[in-house]
Amino acid sequence: MLVRSLTEQVVGDLWPKDYLGEILAINAWVSERVRYLNDPMHVELLKDPQRLCEEILDKGFARGDCDDIAVLMATMALQVGRHAQFVVAGFGAPGSFSHVFARIQDPRSSQWIVCDPVAGSNVASMLKRITTYQIWSCDELPSHGPVETR
């Protein structure tokens, strides 16, 4: 599987059990190689992680929106045994969602690390502006619903 082999390359030079290093390496790799591109108006497109990785190998980069990036980030984290979640967020009225990002758990500290290349270096600022959110586990079937909602 292409996603697995690329993930192994990304984390391959790290010390064993450098879990935070793995998370940060995956975040940096995706940030450097996936460029944000909005979906067309009134259309929701989703590129699977395999396709994004193929584009990266073919062109050196891929294009995708926040959900494409979050799915790739979570898939790569799952490939190295990390727990991952999707945070579906809104910045306006309750229940009005406009963004999604991944967060990955560092098993050593149990802390969740926000991985959002779309926010770039402004992650803290973005998190402060969130007015509504749902957290979905990537480890469970979607039929269970969100694990947390505000």
Predicted regions and their residues:
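A structural boundary/capping signal
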Residues: M1-R150
